């Protein structure tokens, strides 16, 4: 990371979202939190929706380390089965990550987030390496559906309290979350990247 460029960019950047504590948030429903954030951006014409993407992070084993998460204070990572963040590629050339579960700034300059939360694949066993499904926000709003059944145990009890608003569904589906979590490029919407590919595609710096 070179100098204070991300800090300088952040200083001139107007967030696309309300403050973190004013965002729609339900613990362990990151896919819906980001859907609601996309909806907010669509309804408040501050930035073109086409500058924004939902980013699903997972892998074949559904075991991905992410650092700087509120669920794990200190220096260690959380091992999620999947996680979802919002990526804003601003017309000013700087990208920002919106992660409602991080202890990093909200929003956070892309390069800062990658360095602190993802670190490097070189230091991670291959089975834990992250992949990224990047979906345009308009496509995510149009196509995502979840009946929240993945958050119920075998007895039908909620593992975590569900959001108070109705389930998100489309005319075609009530539940397609697994198509977004899947890192099979032949499935679902958007494009799938490795971490180096993701950084190369969206970083403002030459890694």
From Swiss-Prot:
It comes from the Eukaryota. One of its GO terms (molecular function) is protein-N-terminal asparagine amidohydrolase activity. The active site is at 30, 83, 99. Its EC number is 3.5.1.122. One of its GO terms (cellular component) is nucleus. Its main location: cytoplasm. Monomer. It is found in: Cytoplasm, Cytosol; Nucleus. It comes from Bos taurus. Mediates the side-chain deamidation of N-terminal glutamine residues to glutamate, an important step in N-end rule pathway of protein degradation. Conversion of the resulting N-terminal glutamine to glutamate renders the protein susceptible to arginylation, polyubiquitination and degradation as specified by the N-end rule. Does not act on substrates with internal or C-terminal glutamine and does not act on non-glutamine residues in any position. Does not deaminate acetylated N-terminal glutamine. This is Protein N-terminal glutamine amidohydrolase. Belongs to the NTAQ1 family.
């Amino acid at each position: 990371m070179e100098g204070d460029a991300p800090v300088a960019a952040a200083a001139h950047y107007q967030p696309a979202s309300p403050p973190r504590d004013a965002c729609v948030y339900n613990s362990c429903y990151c896919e819906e939190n980001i859907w609601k954030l996309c909806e907010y951006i669509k309804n408040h014409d501050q930035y073109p929706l086409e500058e924004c993407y939902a980013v699903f992070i997972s892998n074949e084993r559904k075991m991905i380390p992410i650092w700087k998460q509120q669920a794990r204070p200190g220096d260690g990572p959380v091992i999620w089965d999947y996680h979802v963040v919002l990526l804003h590629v601003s017309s000013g050339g700087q990208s920002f990550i919106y992660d409602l579960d991080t202890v990093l700034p909200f929003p956070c300059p892309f390069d800062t987030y990658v360095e602190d939360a993802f670190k490097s694949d070189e230091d991670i066993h291959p089975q834990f390496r992250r992949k990224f499904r990047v979906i345009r926000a308009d496509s995510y709003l149009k196509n995502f559906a979840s009946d929240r059944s993945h958050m119920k145990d075998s007895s039908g009890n909620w593992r975590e309290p569900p959001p108070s608003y109705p389930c998100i569904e489309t005319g075609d589906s009530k539940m397609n979350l697994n198509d977004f979590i899947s890192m099979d490029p032949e499935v679902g919407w958007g494009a799938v990247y490795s971490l180096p590919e993701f950084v190369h595609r969206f970083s403002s710096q030459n890694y």
